[in-house]
């Protein structure tokens, strides 16, 4: 038995002294994890976060220019010309409009704006405005300087309040033709006094009629006289109206009372981001590609979770916390006490922490020592595929869907609820599609890396042929001596198998001879052991029979 053990040790020593080359992959101390279709929190050497999560908390310029910040005014205050908004009346240009939640200068005379939400949307979608006079004061033969204490003792800068003059209010008939070549936004109002006395004092009669007509509209208005709850100390109201006069169209107004007449209109030009932000954020000295009500952001990532109301050149919004794409290998820690190379045990056992110049590579052992080198070709191909994957995800998700914070009046609450629900569901679909796409790509990436290692292994296996033997752990034990230059030819694909065939053949025969000798010795020892054991058993049985017959315990009768 000692002879068998000795031969086994010699055989193992003969094999382990062979020059050796292993194929493996990179392992790092990374803590990155990704999810795949079948696994969660899979450790990887490298991962790319696809979701942008930060903003600067400021109002910034965008590619379309600076925002228009209304400060104490509302949009309707600007449009109708609240005297407190005079600084805003000069020609302006903007990329988006900012309305402060605390703004108090809206409609100074109480009343309602017809289709206010549509008006705000129309005005904010333009990029600039220019005020233009529609009706000069001289066109009216009544008083046109009606004022109100609620409007700072004055009145709207874009409308004239027409009242009786010298106790009379003749029919007013005015026309204006748009020769500007652009659309003109014009505004007017109808006054509804609280009492008949107030009505007569202002317009001499109670049964007045006002008509406003263009090629597209024909509106008739009559006053609704009666007291209403006090607002700003007033029981009267003004109903505010607006329309758009297209190039070449004519506006005609006829009235015998209660008319708040157009004075100035707006030529709206260009196109902005069509957004109104209601926020207290401060203006910053910054330019961003994407703006939200929370702040600006610049990113090249395909997704963001800052705000679903982002506008500009923005990544698609998905409401999750993280979305990571695997851009490296499955991170399998190396075994620290296994194999000839210590921590390096082949791709079956784990990754190589010392492989830093590539994702896949080789380690060898020969008379010159131990060496490691990356396989740049397979690594570059894998990196190119990863880059293509990232671009592919961006391309697949680049269909823009902007959610606008729609404004609906109180009577349209159900519309608002339906709109928000639809927006939320669309966002859920985008998020699901994005997550599913990344999970699929992660699964494919990790599977491809496994295939890349196997491909590299099989490439070396084909090159070595019968000049080496596999050890089952991702390594090849060579039948011939292979110095560093020889190892390099294996790595770069120029290995000359014929050059080493004769040496390999002799070494293989030598190893096989040791195996045959050990097998013959094992057979001899087995036969010897079997015969010896049989003799011992036979002698023991004979001694037992002799003892039994001598004391009479056993008797043998022979019958003839």
Region roles according to the model:
Residues 2-560:
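Extracellular/luminal domains of secretory-pathway glycoproteins
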């Amino acid at each position: 038995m000692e002879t068998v053990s000795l031969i086994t040790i010699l055989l193992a020593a003969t094999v382990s002294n062979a020059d050796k080359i292993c194929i493996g992959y990179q392992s790092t101390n990374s803590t990155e994890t990704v999810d795949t279709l079948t696994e969660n929190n899979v450790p990887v050497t490298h991962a790319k976060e696809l979701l942008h999560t930060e903003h600067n908390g400021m109002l910034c310029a965008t590619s379309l220019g600076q925002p228009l910040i209304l400060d104490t005014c509302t949009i309707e205050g600007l449009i109708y010309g609240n005297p407190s908004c005079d600084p805003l009346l000069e020609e302006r240009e903007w990329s988006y409009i900012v309305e402060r939640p605390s703004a108090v200068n809206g409609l100074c005379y109480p009343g309602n704006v017809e289709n206010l939400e549509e008006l705000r949307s129309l005005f904010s979608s333009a990029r600039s405005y220019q005020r233009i006079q529609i009706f000069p004061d001289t066109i009216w033969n009544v008083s046109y300087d009606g004022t109100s204490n609620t409007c700072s003792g004055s009145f709207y800068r874009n409308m004239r309040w027409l009242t009786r003059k010298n106790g009379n209010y003749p029919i007013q008939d005015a026309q204006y033709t748009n020769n500007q070549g652009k659309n003109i936004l014009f505004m007017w109002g109808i006054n509804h006094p609280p009492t008949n006395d107030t009505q007569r004092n202002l317009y001499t009669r109670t049964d007045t009629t006002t008509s406003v007509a263009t090629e597209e509209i024909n509106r008739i208005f009559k006053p609704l006289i009666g007291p209403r709850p006090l607002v700003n100390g007033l029981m009267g109201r003004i109903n505010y109206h607006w329309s758009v006069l297209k190039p070449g169209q004519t506006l005609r107004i006829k009235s015998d009372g209660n008319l708040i007449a157009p004075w100035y209109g707006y030529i709206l030009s260009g196109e902005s981001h069509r957004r109104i932000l209601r926020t207290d954020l401060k203006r910053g000295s910054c330019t961003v590609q994407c703006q939200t009500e929370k702040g600006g952001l610049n990113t090249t990532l395909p997704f963001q979770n800052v705000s679903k109301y982002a506008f500009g050149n923005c990544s698609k919004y998905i409401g999750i916390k993280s979305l990571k794409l695997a851009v490296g290998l499955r991170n399998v820690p190396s075994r620290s006490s296994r194999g000839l190379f210590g921590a390096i045990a082949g791709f079956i056992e784990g990754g190589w922490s010392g492989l830093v110049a590539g994702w896949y590579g080789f380690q060898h052992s020969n008379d010159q020592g131990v060496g490691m080198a990356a396989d740049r070709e397979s690594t570059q191909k894998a990196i190119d595929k990863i880059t293509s994957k990232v671009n592919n995800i961006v391309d697949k998700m680049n269909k823009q869907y902007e959610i606008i914070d729609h404004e609906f009046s109180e009577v349209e609450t159900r519309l608002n609820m339906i709109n928000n629900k639809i927006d939320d569901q669309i966002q859920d679909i985008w998020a699901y599609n994005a997550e599913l796409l990344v999970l699929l790509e992660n699964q494919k990436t990790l599977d491809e890396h496994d295939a890349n290692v196997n491909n590299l292994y099989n490439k070396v296996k084909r090159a070595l042929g019968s000049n080496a033997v596999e050890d089952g752990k991702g390594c090849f034990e060579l039948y011939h001596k292979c110095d560093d230059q020889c190892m390099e030819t294996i790595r770069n694909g120029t290995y000359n198998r014929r050059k080493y065939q004769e040496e390999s053949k002799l070494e293989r025969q030598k190893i096989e001879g040791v195996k045959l000798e050990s097998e013959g010795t094992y057979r001899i020892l087995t036969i010897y052991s079997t015969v010896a054991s049989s003799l011992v058993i036979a002698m023991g049985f004979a001694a037992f029979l002799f003892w039994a017959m001598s004391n009479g315990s056993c008797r043998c009768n022979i019958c003839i």
